Each structure stands twice: as structure tokens, then as C-alpha cells.
């Protein structure tokens, strides 16, 4: 059930409506395609917000994300902290162990009878894009963690991960790294 409090979360709302009943698994689409912060909040509320945050932090501990701390589910709080290294580890874990979540980020759109969610991902059309997520906060500026399949030789490829914080132009920075 989507709450008024979840909808009050800063940012776009993915077309969610107060009182709407929606499966938690469907909330991943506005969250990952459109950066719906209220989608993140609604997921956390479904499981009890504090319990959810505790689980996020315990998962970070389990994955040895030593410098990552979650203070809110959307990543908006300036008290959320992480490092490029930790973001990279987390993306690798999701790619290997929760591939269905990672795969959502490769879709251009997802539609239900009530919603049409469209990707705002700048890298979606980049050759070899395997998935990822970008974001923005005043503290971290433009951020991104993405995975690409890059040609290694005429017949082989290699997955390359890119994680950036504090970028002023993540699209340019990622392009430069991919060309390196």
C-alpha cells in the first residue's frame, strides 16, 4: 500500500498514488528505471522501515562493504555514505547473485495496466551495457555504477565495471573510461 509519507519523498514518484496496492517486486521498476525515491521508501515501509534499513546495513556488513552506511532507503540522506570500491563490490554481488534486479536496469520501459515506467538511464544504448544505476545528490554529485561487456580480442569479451562518485559529467567520464 503506497503511503502519503512515501509519496512525500523528494523526487519523482513513478506515477504512484496514495493508497495504491502494488506488489513490492513491481516497485523495483520505478525505482530502478526512473529513480523513484518514493518507490524505495514504499519498499522499505512494506517491510517496516527501520527493519529494512537494518537489513540493508547488515547486508553491507556481510558483503564487507566496510565504508558503507545506509541511513535511508533512497540514498538521499547526506548520512548515507559509501565508496567507489564498496559500490563496485555491491554491483558485482547484485550482478552475480540477484541478476533479475540488475536486468531491470537494461530495460527501456516497463508497463503494467496502471503504469508505464521509462528508463532515464544515460548508458542504456551504449554498446555492451549490461546494467547499472546512476544517481545524484548534492554531496556526491553525479554518481554511477555500471557494468559493460567490452571486446577483449576479436573473439572474446570481458566485463568491465565502472563506479564514479563526485562527477560533474558522468556520461563524459564513463565514455572516456570505456575508450581507455
Question: Model-derived features: where do they sit?
Answer:
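Non-catalytic, solvent-exposed segments at the cell envelope interface
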Residues: 6-7, 20-28, 32, 44, ...
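Short, glycine/proline-biased beta-turn/loop segments that scaffold the active-site neighborhood
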Residues: 1-14, 106-114
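Penicillin-recognizing serine hydrolase domain
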Residues: 48-180
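Short, small-residue-rich loop/turn micro-motifs
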Residues: 2-6, 35, 64
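Conserved catalytic neighborhood of penicillin-recognizing serine enzymes
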Residues: 8-41, 117-132, 151
Amino acid at each position: 500500500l503506497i503511503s502519503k509519507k512515501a509519496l512525500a519523498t523528494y523526487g519523482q514518484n513513478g506515477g504512484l498514488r496514495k493508497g495504491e496496492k502494488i506488489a513490492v517486486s513491481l516497485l523495483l521498476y520505478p525505482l530502478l528505471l526512473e529513480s523513484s525515491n518514493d518507490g524505495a521508501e514504499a519498499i522499505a515501509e512494506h517491510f517496516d522501515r527501520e527493519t529494512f534499513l537494518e537489513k540493508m546495513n547488515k547486508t553491507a556488513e556481510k558483503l564487507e562493504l566496510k565504508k558503507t552506511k545506509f541511513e535511508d532507503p533512497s540514498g538521499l540522506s547526506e548520512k548515507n555514505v559509501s565508496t567507489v570500491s564498496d559500490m563496485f563490490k555491491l554491483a558485482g554481488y547484485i550482478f552475480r547473485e540477484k541478476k533479475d534486479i540488475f536486468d531491470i536496469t537494461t530495460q527501456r520501459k516497463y508497463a503494467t495496466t496502471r503504469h508505464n515506467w521509462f528508463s532515464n538511464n544515460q548508458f542504456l544504448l551504449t554498446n555492451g551495457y549490461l546494467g547499472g544505476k546512476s544517481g545524484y545528490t548534492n554531496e556526491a554529485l553525479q554518481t554511477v555504477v555500471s557494468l559493460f561487456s567490452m571486446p577483449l580480442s576479436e573473439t572474446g569479451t570481458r566485463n568491465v565495471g565502472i563506479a564514479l562518485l563526485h562527477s560533474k559529467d558522468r556520461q563524459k567520464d564513463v565514455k572516456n573510461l570505456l575508450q581507455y
